[in-house]
């Protein structure tokens, strides 16, 4: 049996016995971030639990809720719509992809309830195009834009090409504005690490505003490097490349699972959402939104929120830990904060202008469910966060005590009219939030 699969099943099925017997004593640490003071309890202050949600689906007529806004189905009957991209012409591209488990990993997922959260199963491995030509909030055209992919996530139209980030490579294809499908031959411009226990498979993609560079997110293969750091080469990073795939370098490192990418309005500063580590207790470690500095290190796997050392990592690098950045905006522990979109549109009230909207896919490693919502982080016109994250789109949880949910938000994107789209990969719906 493949050793990686053995470790993976153990991670899903086992309990953190080391942690239960080695809880650290002492009060929480208080850490100042850009938006608030966050309290970090000692590792294993609470047990590490596995509380997977149970997806029930959306009844007819039921929808998430955003106070003061209208929420309607933009598209339904998709197959795990994971990420969204709006083309310069206003077409919506939906990446349909899912976590794929095989063999013992699949068996273990069913045993512990992981499969009931609707994150696993055959991956559609395609991109669907939605076109609302008359701008009435209902797409009239729905076509297969590109298929035969390998867990696609990041999408980009840039300099005459359509780019897609599969889990194992970045490809580009000749693109004609307004095309409803890709017909030309693709070119693989960058291989990406995806072998073995590919714990974090999403790869996002974004162009610098000046068009000279592309940025690619690559999450870690593991929780805290437990399979060996030889399996983490080129992972837990945001990579920078030229548009033809050449010139690869690490732009920022120590990011366990960076997913959302965006340049804050009013600046050329790159921001990302990061899924932090699991199995240290209910309130460790908070996911976060942070700006990225060229060459900066953000802690993984050695530390979190600056120099807070992870006790499970035995071969520490204290000099590197001293350099670890404290992230800007805490987003709650185990919320699985994924999608990121900045609002520059005309529709939402002024207080939402410039701010960040973040899709929180929801927890599995917490006693009570966290996430399962879209949150909003206010930003100044100069591109700086000004207040903590607040709930924006809620109602995804059906019964918290029973861990039942209607769906799970992931990717977010704004249409040209200023309305917000939210991909719900468990509900197989794209929601539209408008005024």
Regions found by a protein language model. Name each.
Residues 17-19:
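C-terminal motif of bacterial Sec signal peptides marking the signal peptidase cleavage site
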Residues 22-66, 103-105, 122, 202, ...:
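Beta-propeller domain segments
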Residues 87-90, 157-159, 207-211, 264-267, ...:
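Residue-level detector of Asp-centered blade-edge/turn motifs that repeat once per structural unit
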Residues 73-77, 143-149, 189-197, 250-254, ...:
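Surface loop/turn motifs at the tips and blade-to-blade linkers of beta-strand repeat domains
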Residues 413-435:
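Blade-level signature of beta-propeller repeat domains, shared across WD40, Kelch, NHL, RCC1
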Residues 84, 155, 205, 258-261, ...:
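Hydrophobic core register within WD40 beta-propeller blades
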């Amino acid at each position: 049996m493949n050793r990686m699969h053995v470790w993976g099943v153990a991670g899903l099925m086992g309990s953190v016995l080391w942690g239960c017997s080695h809880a650290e004593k002492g009060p929480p640490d208080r850490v100042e971030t850009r938006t608030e003071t966050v309290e970090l309890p000692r590792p294993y202050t609470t047990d590490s639990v596995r509380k997977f949600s149970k997806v029930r689906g959306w009844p007819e007529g039921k929808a998430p809720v955003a106070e003061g806004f209208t929420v309607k189905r933009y598209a339904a009957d998709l197959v795990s719509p994971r990420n969204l991209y709006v083309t310069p012409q206003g077409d919506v591209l939906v990446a349909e992809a899912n976590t794929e488990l095989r063999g013992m990993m699949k068996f273990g997922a069913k045993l512990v309830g992981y499969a009931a959260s609707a994150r696993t199963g055959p991956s559609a491995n395609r991109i669907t195009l939605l076109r609302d030509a008359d701008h009435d909030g209902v797409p009239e055209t729905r076509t297969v834009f590109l298929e035969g992919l390998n867990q696609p996530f990041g999408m980009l139209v840039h300099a005459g090409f359509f780019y897609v980030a599969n889990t194992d490579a970045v490809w580009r294809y000749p693109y004609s504005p307004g095309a409803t499908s890709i017909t030309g031959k693709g070119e693989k411009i960058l291989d990406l690490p995806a072998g073995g226990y590919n714990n974090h498979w999403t790869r996002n993609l974004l162009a610098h505003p000046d068009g000279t560079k592309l940025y690619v997110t690559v999450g870690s293969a593991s929780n805290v490097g437990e399979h060996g750091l030889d399996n983490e080469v080129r992972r837990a990073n945001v990579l920078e490349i030229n548009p033809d795939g050449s010139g690869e370098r690490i732009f920022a490192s120590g990011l366990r699972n960076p997913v959302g990418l965006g340049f804050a309005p009013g600046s050329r500063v790159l921001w990302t959402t990061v899924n932090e580590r699991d199995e240290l207790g209910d309130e460790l470690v908070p996911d976060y939104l942070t700006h990225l500095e060229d060459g900066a290190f953000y802690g993984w796997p050695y530390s979190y929120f600056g120099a807070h050392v992870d006790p499970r990592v035995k071969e520490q690098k204290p000099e590197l830990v001293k350099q670890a950045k404290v992230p800007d905006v805490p987003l709650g522990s185990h919320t699985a904060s994924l999608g990121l979109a900045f609002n520059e549109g005309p529709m939402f009230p002024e207080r939402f202008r410039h701010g960040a909207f973040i899709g929180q896919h929801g927890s599995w490693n917490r006693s009570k469910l966290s996430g399962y919502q879209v949150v909003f982080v206010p930003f100044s016109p100069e591109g700086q966060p000004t207040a903590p994250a607040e709930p924006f789109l809620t109602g995804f949880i059906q019964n918290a005590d029973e861990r039942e949910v209607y769906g799970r938000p992931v990717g977010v994107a704004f249409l040209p009219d200023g309305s917000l789209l939210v991909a719900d990969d468990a509900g197989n719906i794209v929601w539209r939030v408008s005024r």
